[in-house]
Regions:
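Acidic, low-complexity cytosolic segments
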Residues: 1-32, 41-147
């Protein structure tokens, strides 16, 4: 079994701030089970307490993939930017929302969750802490800074 997630080294917000906010979101919104903030390339920035490290990383990778596919569809069909992506499963709902520049907020809900309320609370969280949710893009072709 994996140990609980501790993303302290990856955060752009002060230690614990994103985790606390994600835990609060999961506790307040009926049906929510998990929440994760991720960079657009799928790195975990913050995660709710009930997620193991392995599960947080898996959810972030899945959310990044769906969000990227939706952005590609938006570009191809000239439909504009992606605000939200939703995947409805037999007993769960995955919602991914753009959150700041280069980041996403992904939540996993039971199928009993109120999608409208979940989306509303996600938007409130993103608005409240948008500057903390921004994740700088990784530059692949740039050499590491010397210090």
């Amino acid at each position: 079994m994996s140990e609980p997630w501790s993303p302290r080294s990856l955060k752009t917000a002060p230690p614990g701030e994103l985790d606390w906010l994600l835990d609060d979101l999961v506790a307040r919104v009926r049906g929510l089970r998990h929440a994760v903030v991720l960079s657009n390339d799928g790195l975990v920035v913050g995660a709710s307490d009930a997620l193991t490290r392995e599960d947080a990383e898996h959810l972030a990778a899945v959310a990044s993939g769906f969000h990227s596919l939706a952005k590609g569809a938006g570009r191809h069909f000239r439909a504009g930017g992606v605000r939200q992506t939703m995947v409805e499963m037999d007993v769960g709902i995955l919602i991914i929302a753009a959150a700041g520049d280069g980041a996403c907020l992904a939540v996993l809900s039971s199928s009993a969750g109120d999608v409208g309320m979940i989306a509303y609370e996600m938007a409130r969280l993103v608005t409240r802490v948008g500057e903390h949710l921004a994740a700088p893009p990784r530059l692949r072709d740039q050499p590491p800074a010397s210090g």
